[in-house]
Amino acid sequence: GQGAQKAGMGKDFYEKYDTAKKVFDSASEWLELDMKALCFEENDKLDLTEYTQAALVTTCLAMEKVVEEHGLHPDVTAGLSLGEYCAIAVAGGMSVKNAITTVRKRGILMEQAVPAGEGSMAAVIGLDADRIETVIAGTKAELANYNCPGQIVITGPKTAVEEASVM
């Protein structure tokens, strides 16, 4: 998911497998972005939501196509938030092109709604929802995701999330 991106992601697959190369090159064409430069080279764009989401989904689907090419096919797919798009595409619910172009638009809209540096998220590990609600009371932070037992994500203005994180 978002936050897991890093320069160089998918580069080894791109260089070794034509199937992965095709996904990256097609994404570059569909989005009119140089996905190789975005994903493989150090740059400031990779951490901006409007680029991050397309980069992560492109990388995920490129790797999945290589796995599929080697005869492995999932019986079930699942994803959370951004990962849902990969899961849906892998399951055949949408094309690779639609998944990548949709998350690019999603990222642009999210960036417009909350420009870089204004909002934040933090995973809280080991506290239950009631305790977290007590901690964030009086701040502008909110509960966002119940990821799994023992991990809840808070979100809000950057200063509110930082304030809640210190508590």
Where are the regions a protein language model picked out?
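Hydrophobic side chains within alpha-helical segments
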Residues: 56, 63, 84-89, 109
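Gly/Ala-rich beta-loop-alpha elbow adjacent to hydrolase catalytic centers
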Residues: 60, 75, 79-83, 87, ...
